[in-house]
Curated annotation (Swiss-Prot):
It is a single-pass type III membrane protein. SMART domains: DEATH (SM00005), ZU5 (SM00218). The gene is UNC5CL. Inhibits NF-kappa-B-dependent transcription by impairing NF-kappa-B binding to its targets. This is UNC5C-like protein. It is found in: Membrane; Cytoplasm. Interacts with p65/RELA and NFKB1.
Length: 518
C-alpha cells in the first residue's frame, strides 16, 4: 500500500496544482490579447497607486471612444464636399463633424487667384502659372477652431497662431503658393512654423518646418507651399532666453437695460491675433455678449505663474455676487492658446426706504487689475468698464455684415511700395496717394515718421476695400505711370483684362469675384 500511495502522489499533485496554474496563465494571456493597451496602462497605474483609486478610468475611456467614433464614408464625403464647394468670395462659419471651421473656397485656373478669410488676417495666394492652362482647380482655405487639432506642447512651448488648413489635402501646383497668417510672438525669431501632413479628420502628426524664425516677420507667418496640408506656429525660445507673447484682453457683456437686476462681465485672455478675437465674438453671439471698448495688450511671460484678475472698484449701487474678488487663470491655458475667460457677476443693491438709488444704479463702473502671479508690483494692466442704460449700444447690432477687407497680392504690394517710397520733387509719391485717400497734413507728417510710409498707405487702401482697378485709376491721376504699368501688367497676367476707366467701375463688373479684384 505504501509504495503504491507514494507513486500516486506526484501525478495527483500535478492534477491538483498544475491545472489551476495553467488556467490562470491562459486567462491572463487572453486578457492581454483582448484588453486595449490604454486600459492595461490604467490598470497598472491604479495597482501601483500612482493615481487615486477613485479615478473613473473606464468611464473616461468610454467618453473618449464616443467622441472619436470613426466617421462613415458618406459623412466624410459630405464633410469635404462642403469645404471645397465655392463660396462666391464669402467667408463661411460652420460646425462640421464636431469641428468649428471658418473657410472659403473657389476655383482657380492658370491666372491664379487669392483667398481671404474675413477679419482673420489669413490669406492664400495661388500665383499665375500655378495651374496648367486649360485646367481648373478647386482650392479652399480653412481656419480650424477645434483646439484638439493643435499640437501637443510642452511647458516651454506656446501656441502663437491659429491652425490653418489648405485644401484639398496633398494638392500640389506648378508654382509655390503663399499662405499668410498672423502670430503673436514678441520675438519673431522664436516663432517656429509646424506642419501636419494629414487630413482634417485624421490624427495630427505635427513636425517643424525649418528653423525658428524662418517664416516669421514682425507679426506674420508667410509660408511658400509645395503642397497643401495643415499649418500653425509655435513659440520656442532658445535655452536661457525668456519666451514671451502678446495677449489681447477683451471684455464682453450683455446690454444693461432698465429693470435688470444682474450684469455679468466676461474677460477673455486671447492671443493677439485677429482670428482669436473673432473666435471670442463668435462664442459670445449665443449669449448676446458684445465687445466693450478696444482690447488691451498684455505682455505674457511663458516662464511666470498663473494670470490673476482682481476686482478693485465697483460703482455705488452695485455689489459683487461672487465670493471672491480675485480669480486665477491657469498659466498653461493661456500659454497653449486655449482662449480662456473669467467672469464677474454684479447685482443692483436693494434701495433703502428713505433713499432713491435709481439715479445711481442706471450706470455701472468697474475697475479690474490683471497681472501674472508674483508680478503685481512690477507689471499690471488696468481694465476699466463702464455701461449705462442710455447707451445706444444696448440696441441689437445690425444684421448687415461689413464688406470684407481686400488685400493686394504680396509681390505687387512690395513692388508698389518700392516705387512710392522715395520722396519725389513733384510730390507725386506716397504723400499724394495719402491725400487722395483723405488724409490731412498732420496725419501725413505722422506717417512720414513710420518705418515704411508707403506700406502704411497701401495698407490703408486695403482697409478701404479698394480694388486694383481703383488703384490703377489713382496712379494714372497722380501721373505715376510706372505704378500704373505695374498694376496693368499684373491684371493682364492674372485676369486678361484692362482696368476700368472710372473709379469704382470694377464693383459693377459682375464677372469678377471679390478675390479676383486682387
Amino acid at each position: 500500500m505504501c509504495p503504491q500511495e507514494s507513486s500516486f502522489q506526484p501525478s495527483q499533485f500535478l492534477l491538483l496544482v498544475g491545472v489551476p496554474v495553467a488556467s490562470v496563465l491562459l486567462l491572463a494571456q487572453c486578457l492581454r490579447w483582448h484588453c486595449p493597451r490604454r486600459l492595461l496602462g490604467a490598470c497598472w497605474t491604479l495597482n501601483g497607486q500612482e493615481e487615486p483609486v477613485s479615478q473613473p478610468t473606464p468611464q473616461l475611456e468610454n467618453e473618449v471612444s464616443r467622441q472619436h467614433l470613426p466617421a462613415t464614408l458618406p459623412e466624410m464625403v459630405a464633410f469635404y464636399q462642403e469645404l471645397h464647394t465655392p463660396t462666391q468670395g464669402q467667408t463661411m462659419v460652420r460646425q462640421l463633424m464636431h469641428k468649428l471651421l471658418v473657410f472659403s473656397a473657389r476655383e482657380v485656373d492658370h491666372r491664379g487667384g487669392c483667398l481671404m478669410l474675413q477679419d482673420t488676417g489669413i490669406s492664400l495666394l495661388i500665383p499665375p502659372g500655378a495651374v496648367a492652362v486649360g485646367r481648373q482647380e478647386r482650392v479652399s482655405l480653412i481656419l480650424v477652431w477645434d483646439l484638439s487639432d493643435a499640437p501637443s506642447l510642452s511647458q516651454a512651448q506656446g501656441l502663437v497662431s491659429p491652425v490653418v488648413a489648405c485644401g484639398p489635402h496633398g494638392a500640389s501646383f506648378l508654382k509655390p503658393c503663399t499662405l499668410t497668417f498672423k502670430h503673436c510672438a514678441e520675438q519673431p525669431s522664436h516663432a517656429r512654423t509646424y506642419s501636419s501632413n494629414t487630413t482634417l479628420l485624421d490624427a495630427k502628426v505635427w513636425r517643424p518646418l525649418g528653423r525658428p524664425g524662418a517664416h516669421a516677420s514682425r507679426d506674420e507667418c508667410r509660408i511658400h507651399l509645395s503642397h497643401f496640408s495643415l499649418y500653425t506656429c509655435v513659440l520656442e525660445a532658445p535655452v536661457g532666453r525668456e519666451a514671451r507673447k502678446w495677449l489681447q484682453l477683451a471684455v464682453f457683456c450683455s446690454p444693461l437695460v432698465p429693470g435688470q437686476s444682474h450684469l455679468q462681465l466676461r474677460i477673455y485672455f486671447l492671443n493677439n491675433t485677429p482670428c482669436a478675437l473673432q473666435w471670442a465674438l463668435t462664442n459670445e453671439q449665443p449669449h448676446g455678449g458684445r465687445l466693450r471698448g478696444p482690447c488691451q495688450l498684455f505682455d505674457f511671460n511663458g516662464a511666470r505663474g498663473d494670470q490673476c484678475l482682481k476686482l478693485t472698484y465697483i460703482s455705488e449701487g452695485w455689489e459683487n455676487v461672487d465670493d471672491s474678488s480675485c480669480q486665477l487663470v491657469p498659466h498653461l491655458h493661456i500659454w497653449h492658446g486655449k482662449c480662456p475667460f473669467r467672469s464677474f457677476c454684479f447685482r443692483r443693491k436693494a434701495a433703502d426706504e428713505n433713499e432713491d438709488c435709481s439715479a445711481l444704479t442706471n450706470e455701472i463702473i468697474v475697475t479690474m487689475h490683471t497681472f501674472q502671479d508674483g508680478l503685481e508690483t512690477k507689471y499690471m494692466e488696468i481694465l476699466r468698464f463702464q455701461a449705462s442704460e442710455e447707451e445706444s449700444w444696448a440696441a441689437p447690432p445690425p444684421v448687415s455684415q461689413p464688406p470684407p477687407c481686400n488685400r493686394l497680392p504680396p509681390e505687387l504690394f512690395e513692388q508698389l511700395r518700392m516705387l512710392l517710397e522715395p520722396n519725389s520733387i513733384t510730390g507725386n509719391d506716397w504723400r499724394r496717394l495719402a491725400s487722395h485717400l483723405g488724409l490731412c497734413g498732420m496725419k501725413i507728417r505722422f506717417l512720414s515718421c513710420q518705418r515704411s510710409p508707403a506700406a502704411a498707405i497701401l495698407e490703408l487702401f486695403e482697409e478701404q476695400n479698394g480694388s486694383l482697378q481703383e488703384l490703377h485709376y489713382l496712379m494714372t491721376v497722380m501721373e505715376r505711370l510706372d505704378c500704373a504699368s505695374a498694376i496693368q501688367n499684373y491684371l493682364s497676367g492674372t485676369h486678361g483684362g484692362s482696368p476700368g476707366p472710372e473709379r469704382g467701375g470694377a464693383r459693377d463688373n459682375q464677372g469678377l469675384e471679390l478675390d479676383e479684384k486682387l
